[in-house]
């Protein structure tokens, strides 16, 4: 029985050692080779003093070493923390400090960018560098080289069970900095089992890994492939057309992406032969526009579309079967295998068909909570509705904060987000994190970041600022500072400068909802 994350790979090595497991460019590791790399990484970490449940952060672009570094941490009995390579040093520093990372795996080039923030990461003990470029040591930190992992002596891993921590994935909250969602081995493995079941994955599949591995959706492409003995093909793309070329060149059978990428892919020509091997495509991270779905289906007539909805806090929640797409193209579908999705009122009682309510996810996919954030964990992870009074220990469920409705047949439809998160390009962006960068410039007196509907992005990040000085170049200066301090997906698409204070709600806070309403039609002409 496979119960631990890394055992997905080990099981493949035992079952079909010569089968291709992981490909990056012209280099392919079979399952035996990948299992050996994961074991070598685990021994390497243990030799560096990694203790049970200690965190290993990996801050690299997508490559073979990234995958083995992540799964090797789990195999050692530690916890892996994939860090989005698009993040800026200050954001990486927050993650390293917040979850008390002990070992950081990165490149010499990225290390140079991180040097100013490393003194603030007080739990960090060792740096592991991937690449041959020399790097100066950092005071107080052991410096090791990834190339030395094969020489590490074999060590017994720390004992863990499937209920223990496996990974921490960082996702933005509605207030403050990104929060770490703690996933157990059971969460990750069960997610792979559920997804591979409804996608009907087999060892013959070749799944293109386009999304960041710091996304649960991106990580899922690996675990789903490993669960069935398929091959995951890694890709760092520059242009949407590169994705199409990779699908054709590598004879990809499964492709996952977020709506902004699908919007672009639906506007391009696809080679005629692709549909002969591309079995399915999946969408999550936001609603796929109907014109985009229609465009993809016209270009890929034999490829089955799976429209999904998920929470990092519970992996994946729902999917719409391809045979229902024509009847219910706006639906989120129903619960994935081994999960139950409830729609409830504020008092926890079930909603009637058509009645809006909060989506609550219960089952094996529910994560362990937010790292180092008991208040947010208590808010989001609460007893599941409708439990029997005799249960002494209540089952916890994820209360999503999303408003949905269920039709007479049990299919779900998304209505809106109850918090103020901005969902852009498949990312969740905290308004306050963007606002902090703007306030730090000292250029404006007030700022509010909000998400405005956008045909390509899902939502666009929009800033409204109050500048009493009336400076003519404030918007340009703020945009330049945001580009310098924030990853691309957090940079505002539009900045509106006002000469009067921003509107307030009854509590004296800036009224984001009012601002969002005023700007609701800002991007209507951007629709394809």
Where do the PLM segments sit?
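Conserved pre-ATP/AMP-binding loop-to-beta segment of ANL
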Residues: 2, 18, 151-170, 177, ...
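Conserved AMP-binding/adenylate-forming core of the ANL superfamily
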Residues: 2, 10, 18-63, 67, ...
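Conserved AMP-binding A3 loop
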Residues: 30-33, 159, 166-190
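AMP-binding/adenylate-forming catalytic core of the ANL superfamily
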Residues: 87, 104, 247, 255, ...
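ANL superfamily adenylate-forming
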Residues: 111-162
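AMP-binding/adenylate-forming catalytic domain of the ANL superfamily
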Residues: 130, 487-509
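Conserved AMP-binding/adenylation subdomain of ANL enzymes
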Residues: 189-206, 213-254, 268
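Gly/Ser/Thr-rich phosphate-binding loop
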Residues: 227, 249-257, 266-328, 340, ...
């Amino acid at each position: 029985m496979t119960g631990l994350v890394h055992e997905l790979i080990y099981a493949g090595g035992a079952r079909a050692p010569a089968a291709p497991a992981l490909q990056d460019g012209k280099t392919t590791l079979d399952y035996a080779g990948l299992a050996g790399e994961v074991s070598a990484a685990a021994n390497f970490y243990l030799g560096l003093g990694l203790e049970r449940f200690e965190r290993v952060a990996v801050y690299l672009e997508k490559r073979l070493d990234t995958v083995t570094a992540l799964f090797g941490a789990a195999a050692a009995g530690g916890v892996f923390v994939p860090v989005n390579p698009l993040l800026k040093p200050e954001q990486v520093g927050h993650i390293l400090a917040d979850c008390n990372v002990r070992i950081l795996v990165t490149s010499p080039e990225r290390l140079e960018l991180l040097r100013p923030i490393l003194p603030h990461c007080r739990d960090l003990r060792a740096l592991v560098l991937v690449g041959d470029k020399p790097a100066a040591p950092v005071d107080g930190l052991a410096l090791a080289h990834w190339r030395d992992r094969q020489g590490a002596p074999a060590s017994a891993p720390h004992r863990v069970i499937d209920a223990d921590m496996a990974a921490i994935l960082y996702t933005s909250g509605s207030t403050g900095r990104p929060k770490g969602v703690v996933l157990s081995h059971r969460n990750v493995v069960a997610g792979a089992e559920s997804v591979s079941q409804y996608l009907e994955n087999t060892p013959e599949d070749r799944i293109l890994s386009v999304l960041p591995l710091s996304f649960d959706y991106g990580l899922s492409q690996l675990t789903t492939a490993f669960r069935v003995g398929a091959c995951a093909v890694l890709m760092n793309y520059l242009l949407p057309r590169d994705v199409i070329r990779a699908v054709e060149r590598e004879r990809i059978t499964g492709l996952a992406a977020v709506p902004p990428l699908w919007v672009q892919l639906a506007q391009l020509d696809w080679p005629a032969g692709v549909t002969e091997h591309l079995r399915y495509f999946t969408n999550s991270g936001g609603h796929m526009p109907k014109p985009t779905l229609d465009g993809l289906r016209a270009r890929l007539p034999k490829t089955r579309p799976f429209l999904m909805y998920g929470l990092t806090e519970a992996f994946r929640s729902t999917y719409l079967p391809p045979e229902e797409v024509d009847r219910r193209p706006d639906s989120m579908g129903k619960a994935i295998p081994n999960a139950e999705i409830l729609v409830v009122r504020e008092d926890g009682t079930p909603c009637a068909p058509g009645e809006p309510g909060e989506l609550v996810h219960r089952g094996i996919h529910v994560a362990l909570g937010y790292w180092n954030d008991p208040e947010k964990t208590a808010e989001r992870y609460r007893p599941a509705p409708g439990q029997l009074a005799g249960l002494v220990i209540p089952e916890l469920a994820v209360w999503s904060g999303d408003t949905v409705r269920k039709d007479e047949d049990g299919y779900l439809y998304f209505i809106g987000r109850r918090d103020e998160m901005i969902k852009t390009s498949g990312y969740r962006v905290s308004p306050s994190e963007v606002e902090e960068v703007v306030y730090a410039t000292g250029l404006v007196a007030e700022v509010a970041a909000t998400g405005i509907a956008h045909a390509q992005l899902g939502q666009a990040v929009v800033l409204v600022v109050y500048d009493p000085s009336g400076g003519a170049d404030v918007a340009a200066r703020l945009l330049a500072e945001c580009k310098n301090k924030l990853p691309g997906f957090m940079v505002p698409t539009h900045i509106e400068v006002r000469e009067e204070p921003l509107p307030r709600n009854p509590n004296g806070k800036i009224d984001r909802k009012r601002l969002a309403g005023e700007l609701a039609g800002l991007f209507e002409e951007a629709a394809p």
